[in-house]
């Protein structure tokens, strides 16, 4: 086709001096970015933005001006008048240039003055356009189906490179519909990897009052093709389009859109298939809702003068994605790219929610689904309307929180008070001391601190208390180990540690009887300050439990070694002192302490729980965990109680194995460090009458025994204090890290 115009112009209708009027379409493009011809008019007359014809004045009628342009079959006869078959510009009904009123977008467009109103055009998005394509490659293809007002190739603002897509403006919606039906997924431009996608651009259907009967379909098989999906919905009516949503790796998300020609077949398909039809290879039935048209977010403009700014979208309601904010009810965000076109910087995030819940094809059946005829809402049961966790819903376990937390849960409401996520205690039912778990099952806590041979274990004992005493080389021995009233047999060190409350900032100690009451109260009925206080105490107990338990075992081992050394030293001192030494008491700890160690694993036991569990833990493609029952085929977001008890039993078994291993190691160490046999058999040879005399000299022996406690650690054959300190430090470090 001839692009040039007739260069002959009528002087009477020519442009005013200084204007850009006149010339043909090739050299007169100055006034408009997209025009292919010069706009006419006087010096003050703005040229038509979309004009392709040349010519002088701003009129629409025929004249003698040179008119650049091209022929296509959808223009009326008036478009071809003048200039030997080419579109005319020139004077027209408004008279000579510079006189009379001027039309805002006047140009040589023949009788299509209604097309010049930029509010009447219809904008289409074209995907899978080669990055090397030009306007001349795109325009002729679309002009075969209607009057193309404008073609705009989208380029990157920084680099200037094309983004592989463009926009095409048609004069009427009928022409746009005709182009969509003829070209969508049916024509491949030269150099493209696949067929082009032709769809309405953002908000075009709503702007022109058109209604799309489109369904959103979730729980699709990720290997299913558009043809297979169409076959499922075809029995209910004519399917115009099937769109499968894909991620950045070009893999199906398990959801998509099915477009019907009318509302009745769409409603029939939704009623028959939603919640009933299960695709081959899937475990969950299809979830079908009417697609909710995208609404722009507040503060986001739809674009600049021609086609909109950088926030353009390939389709009007392609993805219905909500950005990860704290409120699930705020307007929808931008869309996902189409299935065959991806921009250089994908906007899709790995964890996003649409208004039907997460893009999870394995959405559990237990989820609550509520819908209307126009919009649909699908949220897991654990989320309330405002994005906060429901008060009747269990907090996800630490294994769930180990990943990125759900983006919509910025804070958790606990008893009417919002607690930040950082103060939330992860994994409390699993890692809390065994004694507190038993207390919840009906066993009372034992509050007072116990004494290991008058070796006091303070109630606020934690990692710091052991470190301050042991690292300084001072053993916390307040009374002699030889006293007869030492309650060694009643040792319950883990219980004392679990009941002890770590000192809160400000050195606020709680009585031992307060802890069970606070732990047994429902979380919703706590005072306003109690939740934070309890969380801090529980966190301190968790961190100190492991280190305290290891330190107690080390102290018991040191106690046995010191008793054995005291026996050997007392045997050497008997000839010099001239009076017998009590012999029955020193042997008592040797028989009691091993029994204490044997009772510790028994305390760690809990009521029997079945070793098998029908619930299993799984992770959805979005990273959220759910639980599936292999017997009832039920899925839940919340962790079932049976699974919680099963995990607790597994952890208790691991703790028992650890305690047995430590006990075995201690026995081996004791066998290696035991004194000669006469040190154990000698007390039985002492007469009974010597016991009162030994009690009379008890005060003298106390001072000597305390000296031995501090000096015998440095004697040959004793434990090196540096090794003790290193062991305690390593135990504390492991406890803090865990």
Swiss-Prot record:
UniProt keywords, alphabetically: Developmental protein, Differentiation, Flowering, Nucleus, Repeat, RNA-binding
Record field: compositional bias (Basic and acidic residues): 109-118
Localization per Swiss-Prot or TrEMBL: Nucleus
Bias (Gly residues) ranges: 52-70, 81-98, 301-311
Domain RRM, first and last residues per copy: 122-203, 213-293
Biased composition (Polar residues): 342-358, 383-401, 575-595, 723-732
Region described as Disordered: 1-118, 292-451, 566-595, 670-738
One Pfam family here: WW
Cellular compartments per GO CC: nucleus; ribonucleoprotein complex
Source domain of life: Eukaryota
UniProt-listed InterPro entries: Hud_Sxl_RNA, Nucleotide-bd_a/b_plait_sf, RBD_domain_sf, RRM_dom, WW_dom, WW_dom_sf
Domain annotation WW: ranges: 609-642
GO biological process: cell differentiation; flower development; regulation of cell size; regulation of flower development; regulation of seed growth
Stored CDD domains: WW (cd00201)
Compositional bias annotation for Low complexity: 368-377, 435-451, 683-706
SMART domains: RRM, WW
GO molecular function: RNA binding
Cross-referenced PANTHER family: RNA BINDING PROTEIN
Protein name: Flowering time control protein FCA
Native source organism of the sequence: Oryza sativa subsp. indica (Rice)
Gene: FCA
